[in-house]
């Protein structure tokens, strides 16, 4: 029996029960959440904040049952569960895991989408992404109630990469989505989609000269041992939607729906501040320990101009050209 089938059988009954209500005001609502991480991770802390805010704002009885450390599967499982309205009611997801339902949603992960943290926060605090939210709800029956994230991805390399001469032909690992390689090819680098668990050895043996990542992952997996030079390209700032099953959301009383949306927005703002702050702290810890040398790229504005044609073509391909322009204009 597959993990998905077994899990669905075990918990679908509980999930259905969580979304059935009596006509009395005293009826208790039970909502089950899922996190891939432990209590110390920023995403889990954000979900806990969401729960806390709902408890504070809602006069009725709501019980939360948040399962941690991947107990209910991985994110791809969560997407299926949310779509079907079984097993879980709320979680945090990477946009890429929802692409099979909503083709334009990976725009959130496109490199150089955001000019800086202020632009990123302005977009996520507005209704600019409403078309993506509508698409996801219509096609996947998954409702976005807030946005967290905040980890900033930069270049990490054996030797310093601070000029376009350094970047030209630079052999680097990128994530598997084609847009990732296309962006760095436009910047004259030589990207390849090496498996993440092979990156350390690939740098150590000279197969690649570097890669790109967030400070937390660099620190946790000690990538600084083989690539001690970090260049502040700030090419990606993480966006992670806080989501709820549409079936669950629609089953809630109207006053609880309003509270969920308010709590999701506030929890998202909390999570963004938390993760972006932790990102800076972890980076500084590695600098203070002498593990990393940090440099600014000499002309990041030119990077933004060089990648625009690639971004435009990608947005057109996934039907998100108007959305891309709206993000840029924010």
Curated annotation (Swiss-Prot):
Q: Where does alpha-D-taluronate bind?
A: 75, 97, 153, 173, 196, 213-214, 240
Signal sequence coordinates: 1-27
Q: Which UniProt keywords apply?
A: Periplasm, Signal, Transport
Q: Does the keyword DNA-binding apply?
A: no
**Residues annotated to bind alpha-D-mannuronate:** 75, 97, 153, 173, 196, 213-214, 240
- Source organism superkingdom: Bacteria
Q: Which GO terms describe its biological process?
A: transmembrane transport
Q: Which GO terms describe its cellular component?
A: outer membrane-bounded periplasmic space
Asked if the Swiss-Prot or TrEMBL record annotates the protein with the keyword DNA-binding, the reply is no
Concerning Pfam families, the annotation shows: DctP
Where's it found, cell-wise? Answer: Periplasm
UniProt record similarity statement: Belongs to the bacterial solute-binding protein 7 family.
Role noted for this protein: Solute-binding protein that binds D-mannuronate and D-taluronate (in vitro). Probably part of a tripartite ATP-independent periplasmic (TRAP) transport system that mediates solute transport into the cytoplasm.
Cite the record's note on assembly: The complex is comprised of an extracytoplasmic solute-binding protein and a heteromeric permease formed by two transmembrane proteins.
Question: What's the name of the protein?
Answer: Solute-binding protein NAS141_03721
Species of origin reads Sulfitobacter sp. (strain NAS-14.1)
């Amino acid at each position: 029996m597959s993990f998905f089938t077994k899990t669905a059988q075990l918990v679908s009954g509980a999930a259905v029960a969580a979304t059935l209500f009596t006509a009395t005001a005293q009826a208790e609502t039970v909502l089950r959440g899922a996190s891939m991480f432990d209590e110390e991770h920023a995403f889990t802390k954000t979900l806990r904040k969401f729960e806390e805010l709902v408890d504070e704002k809602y006069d009725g009885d709501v019980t939360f049952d948040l399962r941690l450390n991947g107990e209910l599967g991985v994110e791809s499982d969560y997407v299926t569960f949310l779509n079907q309205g079984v097993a879980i009611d709320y979680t945090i997801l990477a946009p890429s895991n929802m692409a099979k339902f909503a083709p334009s949603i990976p725009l959130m992960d496109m490199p150089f989408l955001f000019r800086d943290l202020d632009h990123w926060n302005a977009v996520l605090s507005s209704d600019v992404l409403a078309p993506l939210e509508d698409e996801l709800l219509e096609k996947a029956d998954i409702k976005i109630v807030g946005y967290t994230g905040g980890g900033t991805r930069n270049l990490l390399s054996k030797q310093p990469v601070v000029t376009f001469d350094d970047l030209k032909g630079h052999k680097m690992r990128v994530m598997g989505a084609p847009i990732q390689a296309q962006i760095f090819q436009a910047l004259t680098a030589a990207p390849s989609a090496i498996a993440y668990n092979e990156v350390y050895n690939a740098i150590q043996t000279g197969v690649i000269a570097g890669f790109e990542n967030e400070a937390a992952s660099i620190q946790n997996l000690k990538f600084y041992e083989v690539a001690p030079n970090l260049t502040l390209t700030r090419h990606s700032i993480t966006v992670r939607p806080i989501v709820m099953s549409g079936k669950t959301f629609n089953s809630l009383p109207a006053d609880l729906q309003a509270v969920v949306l308010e709590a999701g927005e506030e929890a998202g703002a909390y999570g963004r501040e938390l993760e972006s702050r932790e990102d800076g702290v972890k980076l500084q810890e590695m600098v203070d320990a002498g593990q990393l040398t940090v440099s600014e790229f000499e002309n990041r504005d030119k990077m933004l101009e060089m990648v625009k044609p690639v971004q435009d073509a990608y947005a057109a391909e996934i039907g998100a050209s108007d959305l891309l322009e709206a993000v840029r204009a924010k």
